[in-house]
Each structure stands twice: as structure tokens, then as C-alpha cells.
Amino acid sequence: MKQDQNLRFVIIGMGYLMEYIAPCYSKLLGDKKAEQMLGVTAEPQAVQSKAKATGIPVILNDNAGALRRMEPDIILFAPPPSLAAPLTESVLVPYFAECRAAGKELPMLFAFPPKPEGKYYQEQLGHDCKVVNILPNMISEICGRTCAEAGFTMVTLPESHTWQPEELDFIRRFWQPLGQVVFLTPAEVQVALAVSCSNQMLSEIFLDMQTALPE
């Protein structure tokens, strides 16, 4: 792999989640962030606000152009779940084919929609495609106090994958600002999600009880 600060990123789906994880790519790239990253949004009114909030250039609706312009090492793929498969077929499949035809190294794919799973991307993009599904830790601050280190980001690896140990170490480094990283199989992530949702509901109930009950 390249050194961390030399990695190039394209964000497809520059919404709230990609703004929330800005501490991760900001720490990784430092003052090279603005030249090493490019975000794409489908919302005209969000272009300037997202660029200002994240410190990276953001363009409107040109996913294919962003990929060709940046030739990214990593694609942060965060469209709405309903658009994940259509954008894979219309944008990612042609771009990966272009990379192969030119003899270029394929970019890593960080897919944020929970579905499709990594197996789908491998079927569409090739089984040598390095893809993970990612559910970031979404509780990084409570009442103004940082608590990210108590949480974890769930990274789901396809059952058959070609990720190397140093690349998995990179994933841990990238997500470190949001806490620990837990690597899961597709079967394990379903259980982990159920437990996580149950914990969230219980915590809300306990807080409501604490508020309602007398001292």
C-alpha cells in the first residue's frame, strides 16, 4: 500500500454519514486532505455546505468523472441503500473495467449501505475486488464529552476475500478516531446488529425511567 497520507479517495454519496466520519479521513491525510479527496453529492444545495464542513472539494452528480479525475485508491461508497445496486452497475462496473483494461490497481471499496453484502460487489466487480461493508460507530460524543473509544465500528468481510494483513491494519487505523474496529462475517453482523439495536432501546428505556422516577 501507499503511505497513508498519499492515498486518494472519492466519496460517492456525500451525505450526513460522510460528513460525520470526517475525523477519520482528516486525521489520515492531514493538510493533504483537500488535494487527495473528492466528494460527489446529488443535492445541489449541499455542494458548498458539504465542502465547507469537511474541507474537501465537492461536486454535483458526476460520479464517473470524479473517479476518472482522482483515480482513487479507496472509494467511500455511501449512496442511499436503494441506489447502491444501480450505481454499482452504472458507475463502478465500468470504472473497474477501465482500470483492468489499463492495467491499473483496483481501488478498495468501503461500502456503507448494509445491503448489498460484499459478495454482490465481488460478483459485479470481480472476486479480486477488495470490499467491506461498514457500519461506523455512531456514538462518539455524549453531552459534549468524547466517548468514541468506548464504541466500535463493524467491518464485514466477504466470506471469500483477498484483504492482506497490512490492509486490515490500515482499516483499523482509518477508523481509530471513532473507536475500536470489529471484523465480522456476514452471518455474525446480523447477530451484532440485533444486539446493538437491543442495547440502544434498553438504554433509552433506562434514561426515561431515570428521568421519570423520583429521587
Spans of features found by a protein language model:
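A structural micro-motif
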Residues: E35, I56, P107, C129-K130, ...
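Short, hydrophobic beta-strand segments that form beta-sheet elements in well-ordered domains
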Residues: M37-A42, L109-F112, V155
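Rossmann-like NAD(P)(H) cofactor-binding subdomain of soluble oxidoreductases
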Residues: N63-G65, M70-E149
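Short glycine/serine/threonine-rich phosphate/pyrophosphate-binding segments
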Residues: Y16-I21, A84-P86, G118, S203
